[in-house]
Amino acid sequence: MKIILTGLHEDADIDKLRERMSQFGPVLDIQAVRDGDPDKPWFIVNLNVDMAHATDVARRIDGIYYIDRFLHARVMFNG
């Protein structure tokens, strides 16, 4: 399942993000989307987990204050 993360800094380290997200399950891929406002990229994290687990992960991450910003996480139901 894919989780959309917003709120990370523009210079977020994909390898560090992969490492941190791997605590929730196997990370298949991470795509950085920098179109639009380059200061506010968003990331699509593809985890090898079912929808229920992905929803739990998104709920745990959503609203965390990380490096001067609040993170937001949503499960991507299509795609």
Where are these regions (language model features)?
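Canonical RRM/RBD RNA-binding surface and closely related RRM-like beta-sheet modules
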Residues: 1-74
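Glycine-rich beta-strand-turn "strand-cap" elements at beta-sheet edges
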Residues: 76-79
